[in-house]
Amino acid sequence: SYNQIVFGTVKEAWNMGAIAVGATIYFGSEQSRRQIVEVSQAFEYAHELGMATILWCYLRNSGFKKDGTDYHAAADLTGQANHIGVTIKADIVKQKLPSNNGGFKAIGFGKTNERMYTELTTDHPIDLCRYQVANGYMGRVGLINSGGESHGESDLHDAVVTAVVNKRAGGMGLISGRKAFQKPMKDGVQLLNTIQDVYLDSSITIA
């Protein structure tokens, strides 16, 4: 059911010395409306205390799969989730890297315009990710992409590709937990250091 619940308070986090709070909203799930309201209220209070806010903006609904295509990581649908996330005052948004586009048209999720697909983006991975960035007030709210699950030997390559796409699209980072922490210490550290190298490399610029 993806029924995320609040199991602590912002004030408790503040009292323990935390400088930020995070939450997850599963947009499209049965509980998403409640999650949006609760997270919005929590983030409002966090900002009153001077804390930063991070939101995991994930899509969860069986209706997002149609005719054999999974639109849970579509650029337009994830972009809309990002927009709602920043509207309720997330300072950083975490989102899956787009794998396709056209979710609005395929499932009739809401109103859209054909120019979104013909003029605002292309099928290039960087352009699809850039559309996610644009939905965060044109990049003023940072986009961090997910590293995804571990696939073994290809993890280092996959992490570098995701980091390069995110950085060149105007994103601000990559979270790569499972790819790093499900490995021996040496391999996990190497993967994280390689991701850092991408963001520290001045020759990798916004496309």
Language-model segment annotations:
Residues 1-144, 156-172, 197-200:
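Alpha/beta enzyme core
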Residues 28, 180-181:
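Short beta->alpha junction loops/turns
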Residues 100, 148-153, 181-182:
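Short Gly/Pro-enriched loop/turn and capping motifs at secondary-structure junctions
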Residues 143-149, 176-179:
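Glycine-rich beta-strand-to-loop/alpha-helix junction loops that act as flexible
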Residues 169-170, 181-207:
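C-terminal helical cap(s) of enzyme catalytic domains, especially alpha/beta-barrels
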